[in-house]
């Protein structure tokens, strides 16, 4: 009983696909319903918003026309910018230590980008700018900017669109 020949195969490590045949109803592990928090016309993007379309985590699923709302947000940014500009001379006279911070704040202010965080300020300066409506305008603007993000719907995880109840160009 001596073994004369032993046959071997060289194994190459890597991913192998295993198939397990089965019958029955297949249910998705994660199935969610995505709805829009804003109204508007659905824009055409690639890939098309159709049933069976695969999406990766963070990929745009749908874009809703936002040009009118975006223009409103930019107008509110300009309004905040004007409010701050109007109080700069008073800040320079009454609170010279705070003037530098607010001046730098205005230099990094860009109407096309989200509003930067307000500079650090003492209680007296906070009361002064609050009395001029700057703080309330700032937080209103932050709310508008948050709503602006709802015009872009992104995939919360990688998966497949099972059902689409709207099509491009519709409300």
Please describe what each predicted stretch is.
Residues 24:
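Active-site-adjacent helical/loop segments in soluble small-molecule enzymes
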Residues 4-14, 27, 39, 43-44, ...:
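Periplasmic scaffold and linker elements that assemble and bridge Gram-negative envelope complexes
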Residues 36:
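Conserved phosphate/oxyanion-binding catalytic-loop motifs
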């Amino acid at each position: 009983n001596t073994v004369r020949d032993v046959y071997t195969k060289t194994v190459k490590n890597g991913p192998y696909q295993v198939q397990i045949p089965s019958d029955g109803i297949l249910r998705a592990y994660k199935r969610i319903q995505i709805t829009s928090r804003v109204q508007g016309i659905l824009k055409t993007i690639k890939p098309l918003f159709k049933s069976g379309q695969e999406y990766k985590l963070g990929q745009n699923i749908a874009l809703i026309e936002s040009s009118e709302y975006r223009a409103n947000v930019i107008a509110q940014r300009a309004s905040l910018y004007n409010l701050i500009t109007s109080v700069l001379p008073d800040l320079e006279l009454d609170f010279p230590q705070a003037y530098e911070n607010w001046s730098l704040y205005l230099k990094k202010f860009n109407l096309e980008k989200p509003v930067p965080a307000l500079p650090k300020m003492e209680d007296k300066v906070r009361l002064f700018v609050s009395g001029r409506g700057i703080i309330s305008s700032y937080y209103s603007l932050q709310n508008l900017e948050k709503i602006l993000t709802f015009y872009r719907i992104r995939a919360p995880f990688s998966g497949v669109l099972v059902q689409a109840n709207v099509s491009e160009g519709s409300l």
